[in-house]
């Protein structure tokens, strides 16, 4: 079994409070993917991001996820590897972006803050990520073009749920 991070999240459209039992079920369904660290962040009553971490590039705790952008507006959960993150980082630093980690997650997040969905045009690698924009109250879901890193989602009249594994969505009961 190849290890990799696990990502997931829940968004209740009617803004009702997320049941913590459900997010714990989702996290527990993904913990085998990321043995190094796991966390659920409730960004509001109705928005939760979940991450189980397999630390590869930056082992520092500051690279734990979900991660929040410098502007405090955006939050990310990310699974994968951005091969050209050092080049992207240099470009962003030349535009005044300051980084607090050495890994590719923060680079990806700040690149999204700078370029929006156009960030997909500059990324090289294998990835699945979701960014929540607290100002717009919206999600941006993306994965690499080949689909090396999985990202599944389900939308119904009540909520959006996404995950690295279908099993986590099914286990949630949503």
Q: What is each residue range found by the language model?
A:
Residues 2-174:
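Cysteine-centered catalytic environments shared across enzyme families
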